[in-house]
Amino acid sequence: MEKIIKNGKLVTDSEIFDADILIRDEKIVAVGKEFNESNAEIIDASGKLVLPGGVDAHVHLDLPMPGTVSSDDHYTGTKAAAFGGTTTVIDFANHDLPSLIDSFNVWQEKALPNVAIDYGIHQNFTRFNENTLKE
């Protein structure tokens, strides 16, 4: 199924211009005018700005803390982000296990089935040793 966002003002990092957006299989495939509308769902963006999705490069989702866990889990936090126009988050993952890679994999297995938007992970080095150096 195709969608066309029509009549909006597209905002980029350098300009604002009139254009339509053609979406196929949930991906933007073209920006321009005069797309074939015969089989497309039309979204009228007249009088509206059309912006790219935001990226939040530092979030804490389902993060254990002494005696509690952060308020949003991976689903509620990414769903709330989407409602605010954020389409990608980079989540903090604890380095709780002896291996950085194991900590990363455990966090990813916990998160990925539950996220509602694009998702990445960053970690800190809470300890540095020979194993960490090898990884």
What function would you assign to each model-found segment?
Residues 38-39, 70, 115, 121:
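Glycine-rich, flexible loop/turn motifs
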Residues 108-135:
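Metal-coordinating catalytic core of metallo-dependent amide/deamination hydrolases
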Residues 45-114:
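Metal-associated gating/positioning segment near the N- to mid-region
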